[in-house]
Amino acid sequence: MAKTKRQIAEDLRLIDVVIEIRDARIPVSSQNPDMKELIKNKKQIIVLNKSDLADEKETLKWIKHFKDNGLSAISASSNSGKGINNVIKEIDKLMEEERKVSEQKGRVGKATRVLVIGIPNVGKSSFINRISKKTTMAVGNKPGVTKQKQWIRLSNNIELLDTPGVLWPKFESEEVALNLAFTGTIKDDILPKVEVAYRLLKFLLENYKNNVIERYKINKE
């Protein structure tokens, strides 16, 4: 992890905008706290990915929360493509003034360089495949599929730099660890499987009981 952090810190010197991919189901738990300090001086966009798997009402609340705190935030689904074009628009919006200054100085057509970060299994590679309209990157429901740094050029003068997903060495709370386990972000053998299953079912029954009953055709009687 230390090596990857050093590489990201070095790459940030070349970057205009940072896109942080988070899981819309766990928007706080899916942020690497070590990255927060690294990117604090850069323009940022939080993309709540996998929105098709999340509670839409809760996602909208989180989007409002981030915006109320001065952060750009967008709900998206790399699976369906919903919200992806809004990310491009937000990049253009954030870079509007800088582009005007560059044009005044004669640097017309200067590419906007964007760093895409995120912990494993939040859909980073799927997001880049969708936004670049390609399927050349390794994608899978397995933490840590992306291993090497990759530059991807988009048609609208934006260059994306992808980096491997990085988890932090110690989770600050049991809730964070459980949330990561619920969504398959950490390996199955890190936490006791029975405990994870019990806690997830308990959460679902307390918050989405009718959904569970409908999904598994449970007889209410």
How would you describe each model-predicted region?
Residues 42-52:
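Active-site cofactor/substrate anionic-group-binding motifs, chiefly glycine-
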Residues 38, 65, 69, 90-98, ...:
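Conserved, well-folded catalytic cores of nucleic-acid-processing
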Residues 22-25, 51, 131, 164:
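Anionic group-transfer/hydrolysis microenvironments
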Residues 23, 66, 127, 162-163:
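Residue-level signature of catalytic and energy-coupling elements of molecular machines
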Residues 51-118, 136:
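Canonical P-loop GTPase G-domain recognition
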